Amino acid sequence: GTLEIRGASTHNLQNVDVDIPLGVLCVITGVAGSGKSSLIHGSLPTDAGVVMVDQAAIRGSRRSNPATYTGLLDPIRAAFAKANGVKPALFSPNSAGACPACNGAGVIYTDLAMMAGVVTVCEECEGKRFQAEVLEYTLNGKDISEVLSMSATEAEAFFADGTVTKPAAHAILTRMVDVGLGYLRLGQPLTTLSGGERQRLKLAIHMAEKGGVYVLDEPTTGLHLADVEQLLALLDRLVDAGKSVIVIEHHQAV
């Protein structure tokens, strides 16, 4: 089948008709300003089950991180609570277990009237974000701060281990590794991510959805060539799973 675009006239497009094939990886390419994004974002039918994955900033506070954004923190908290016989809220830096000095931020923000604010590591929790008594609870020898300091790759192995098998957490971590974010720390603030990293984090979430058509806008931005190959392998797997993938891109490897 095809996705039909008729009479596209957004920005510098002039009455363009295009049939985009479905069930394959389709690349929309062209020089900068040629109307690639206008053609797709401005003209795709809204009812086509399309999942748009862009590089726009992720909404969230400076407390947000990959663990909270992907929903990963929920199964992690549940695993800690079950292992220690306490309530899950203790294992959230935004809830009952937060360090009282920095309110779970791990840093102290000092606003200076005439200059840029100053950020210092909290002396009480030493940047770990949790109360000392919460850090005494462990899961397979690791406290919650140590788990949130792990990279996605390390955490994927940790939650696949027979002693802490947690399928919900492992599934999310596997998707993060699949999109090339295996190096990302679970507790890293979202405000520190690049546009390409934000886009791939969104893709990791959308991969769990039932959408039939994925649209990615220049997903290779900021990627090393080896990571581009990993991304292409992922897109191929999406197509093999019956999805349609439309990529707006001018990277020659794609």
Where are these regions (language model features)?
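Conserved phosphate-binding elements of NTP-dependent enzyme cores
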Residues: G1-V254
